[in-house]
Swiss-Prot record:
Residues 134-148, 189-198 have a biased composition (Low complexity). It is found in: Nucleus. It comes from the Eukaryota. Associated with the Mediator complex. InterPro entries: MED2_plant. Residues 202-211 have a biased composition (Basic residues). Keywords: Nucleus, Phosphoprotein. GO terms for cellular component: mediator complex; nucleolus. Its main location: nucleus. Residues 128-211 are annotated as: Disordered. The modification Phosphoserine is found at S173. This is Mediator-associated protein 2.
Length: 211
């Protein structure tokens, strides 16, 4: 069966020099050294003074790398190894014929205690990052508050307008009915007045004839 294997993005190919299998023997001791990514120190010393039988801190050296921003020139490193953390793994050199050259006998950690100036610089950088983050968060909150207040004021004004229009507007049909009824009343009153005047004129005529 064919398997399609894809390397993840976190995988980094080491550019260090490969081991030469001609100089390796079964009696050589290999260490698995752990250090932060991009902060591996440079060791110019040909020999290291160590106490191989000691558990814990068993040696030290000075870093000669002046180009790294995270490390100080001449910084002191301690070599730490604990028997409970021994790797117990085989070291294999990749080649045409993969060959086992030895066992990883120690898991070594590089321990360095930073200088006070380094700690102050790190604290300043962290405080600046926090201040920038707080400023951006406050600006976002203020913009959100202004937008919400504008939305609320717009809804309130529209509601007030609708309520005001509801109070001011009166139905037109009752006015028309009232005007029509009032005009009818005026017409009836005028007709009664005219009728009464005609009757009075007739009565006057009758009186004259009788005389």
């Amino acid at each position: 069966m064919d398997f399609d294997f894809k390397v993840s993005g976190d995988f980094i190919v080491s550019g260090a020099e490969q081991l030469d299998d001609t100089d390796l023997t079964r009696s050589d001791e290999f260490w698995l050294i752990q250090a932060p990514l991009g902060q591996f120190p440079e060791i110019e010393e040909n020999t290291l003074k160590i106490e191989p039988d000691k558990d814990g801190l068993f040696g030290e050296f000075k870093d000669s790398n002046a180009g790294s921003l995270h490390l100080c020139l001449g910084a002191k490193y301690d070599l730490a190894s604990f028997h409970s953390q021994d790797a117990g793994a085989e070291l294999i050199i990749p080649s045409e014929e993969s060959m086992i050259v030895g066992k990883i006998t120690r898991r070594v950690a590089l321990v360095r205690y930073p200088e006070p100036n380094e700690l102050l610089q790190k604290m300043k950088a962290r405080t600046q990052q926090k201040l920038v983050g707080s400023v951006t968060n406050s600006s976002k909150k203020s913009s959100n508050l202004t937008q919400s207040s504008r939305h609320k004021s717009g809804t309130r004004s529209s509601r007030e307008k609708s309520m005001f229009s509801g109070f001011t507007e009166t139905p037109k049909s009752p006015k028309r009915k009232n005007s029509e009824s009032s005009s009818g009343k005026h017409r009836s009153s005028t007709s009664t007045v005219s009728g009464s005047s005609e009757r009075s004129a007739k009565s006057k005529k009758k009186v004259k004839k009788e005389e």
